[in-house]
UniProtKB/Swiss-Prot annotation:
InterPro entries: AICAR_Tfase_dup_dom_sf, Cytidine_deaminase-like, MGS-like_dom, MGS-like_dom_sf, PurH-like. It catalyses: (6R)-10-formyltetrahydrofolate + 5-amino-1-(5-phospho-beta-D-ribosyl)imidazole-4-carboxamide = 5-formamido-1-(5-phospho-D-ribosyl)imidazole-4-carboxamide + (6S)-5,6,7,8-tetrahydrofolate; IMP + H2O = 5-formamido-1-(5-phospho-D-ribosyl)imidazole-4-carboxamide. The IMP cyclohydrolase activity resides in the N-terminal region. The keyword Hydrolase applies. This is Bifunctional purine biosynthesis protein PurH. Gene3D superfamilies: 3.40.140.20, Methylglyoxal synthase-like domain. Its EC number is 2.1.2.3, 3.5.4.10. The keyword Hydrolase applies. The gene is purH. It comes from Mycobacterium sp. (strain KMS). It comes from the Bacteria. Belongs to the PurH family. Pfam families: AICARFT_IMPCHas, MGS. GO terms for molecular function: IMP cyclohydrolase activity; phosphoribosylaminoimidazolecarboxamide formyltransferase activity. Signal peptide: none annotated.
Length: 527
């Protein structure tokens, strides 16, 4: 055999193929094309039957192995006559001689896709049904062929079949092409193994009840888009999707506008999550991952947007808007008059997209509701952090469980505003103070390194609207100064977690100011 087969540009002819697929998409066209090109086809079980039923010559794998399919199909291809043909490096004379002595023919092409394990799990199937969909022979063939890519080409998805037929007609795949196919194949089996291992760890062999988080975490992400740049123009960036995750912003459909940027995605994700923190119709406007305004309404989504925008119109310029409701024509008319980077919603009423599209560059997204459970990952140098998602589901997130530390019990309207303020705090970077009136933020103090400055910023932004408003703090007041900043400005009721060594001093300051002060016992830091 000539040495030029080891060169990247040299092609290796395809004379013998092994095909074993669960997904039969494109199978007949592939098999017919291979046959017409003079390729001998060896196949397994239902794949062989599907090919033969169309009158295409095919050799059942048991004719090659001399051993029948057994154990309900669990053993079909796990045989030396198959794997020697996959693993023989035909660049090596000793491998070629060994095959000849054993009467084994090498394979030039392997086409395999695997049992639908993840789909079976997602369907709610029983444990036994899921176990039966753990493919053994398929990954073994794929890995063997991929390892032996100098001699074998391997294809694992139907979207690669056109490339196979093109290669067959033009003398085969080059070594460089076989390397790419091998890389794709190992990614395919890696994704499969991660799915199986994750399911095994969570279902068949879960941690002890005291261990709420797994001892091992695996995941795979596929690049979905190369972005113009990252947070800054000198940084490269791309969007990756987790095929096993709850559909989220990464899977959003873009209806109009320029391509999404890295910062668009981070802000849209923050806005999307903030909007769904509330059961009522809600609109959140985000800039640099912090709220410019959040509002709820019992009237309309347009009303919620109006109130959210009024919180901080200056900062909302060039912001990202999200709502948990369908965007109405009325809201679209208003948004179309404001420079907005992105708007994301679960749906749009007829005519709304056309109105928004008057702005050439606005990015219009449709996305599914974000998950309310699960875990979050954050990379750090040398590892990552994993935590339970803050889903506002702590006992202290329900006003029924709040403790009135001082003052008169709030009336229903005031309590509703306190609840909204408390839930809105989750979306604000710590230290966070939120001032609320009539179901809308009117002042947001975010990202300060001390709580009193967060209170001052919230009061400053609220202006005259602070009088008679309510406020929430994402963590306890360590000193009374932050609370006093709010009460002196005119805030009439405050909710905070409590738990400080100086809670009694803070409560005394609230009593002196004559306000209602509630303790939640829960905290909502966001870093």
């Amino acid at each position: 055999m000539s040495g030029d087969q080891g060169q990247a540009g040299a092609k290796r002819p395809i004379r013998r193929a092994l095909i074993s697929v669960y997904d039969k998409t494109g199978l007949i066209d592939l098999a017919r094309g291979l046959h017409e090109a003079g390729v001998d086809i060896v196949s397994t079980g239902s794949t062989a039957k599907t090919i033969a039923d169309k009158g295409i010559p095919v050799t059942p794998v048991e004719f090659v192995t001399g051993f029948p399919e057994v154990l309900d199909g669990r053993v079909k291809t796990l045989h030396p006559h198959i794997h020697a043909g996959l693993l023989a490096d035909t660049r090596k004379p000793e491998h070629v001689e060994a095959l000849a002595k054993l009467g084994i023919a090498p394979f030039d092409l392997v086409v395999v896709n695997l049992y639908p394990f993840s789909e079976t799990v997602e369907s709610g199937a029983s444990v036994d049904e899921c176990v039966e969909q753990i493919d053994i022979g398929g990954p073994s063939m794929v890995r063997a062929a991929a390892k032996n890519h100098p001699s074998v080409a391997v294809v694992v998805e139907p979207n690669g079949y056109d490339g196979v037929l093109a290669a067959v007609r033009t003398g085969g795949f080059t070594l460089a092409e076989r390397k790419i196919l091998a890389s794709l194949a190992f990614r395919h089996t890696a994704e499969y193994d991660v799915a199986v291992a994750s399911w095994m760890g969570s279902t068949l062999a879960p941690e002890e009840p005291a261990q709420k988080l797994p001892a091992w975490v695996g995941g795979t992400w596929r690049r979905a888009a190369v972005l113009r740049y990252g947070e800054n123009p000198h940084q490269q960036a791309a969007l990756y999707r987790d095929a096993t995750a709850w559909p989220g912003l990464a899977q959003a459909e873009q209806l109009h506008g320029k391509e999404m940027s890295y910062n668009n995605y981070t802000d849209a994700d923050a806005a999307w999550r903030a909007a769904f923190d509330h059961e009522e119709i809600c609109v959140a406007i985000i800039k640099h991952a912090n709220p410019c305004g959040i509002a709820i309404s019992s009237v309309s989504v347009a009303d919620a947007h109006r109130k959210a925008h009024e919180c901080d119109p200056l900062s909302a310029f060039g912001g990202v808007i999200a709502t948990n409701s369908s965007v109405s024509v009325e809201m679209a008319e208003t948004v179309a008059d404001i420079f907005t980077e992105v708007i994301v919603a679960p749906a749009y009423e007829p005519g709304a997209v056309e109105i928004l599209s008057r702005k050439k560059n606005i990015r219009i997204l449709v996305a599914a509701q974000p998950p309310t459970t699960g875990t979050e990952l954050r990379p750090i140098s040398g590892g990552l952090l994993l935590q339970q998602r803050d889903a506002l589901d702590a006992d202290g997130d329900d006003p029924v469980n709040w403790t009135l530390a001082t003052g008169e019990p709030a009336d229903p309207a005031t309590l509703a505003n306190l609840k909204f303020a408390w839930r809105s705090c989750r979306a604000v970077k710590s230290n966070a103070i939120v001032v609320v009136a009539d179901g809308a933020t009117v002042g947001v103090g975010m990202g300060q390194v001390n709580r009193v400055d967060a209170a001052r910023l919230a009061v400053q932004r609220a202006g005259d609207r602070v009088r008679g408003a309510v406020a929430a703090s994402d963590a306890f007041f360590p000193f009374p100064d932050g609370l006093e900043t709010l009460t002196e400005a005119g805030v009439k009721a405050i909710v905070h977690p409590g738990g400080s060594m100086r809670d009694d001093v803070v409560t005394e300051a609230a009593a002196k100011a004559g306000i209602s002060l509630y303790l939640t016992g829960a905290r909502h830091f966001a870093h």
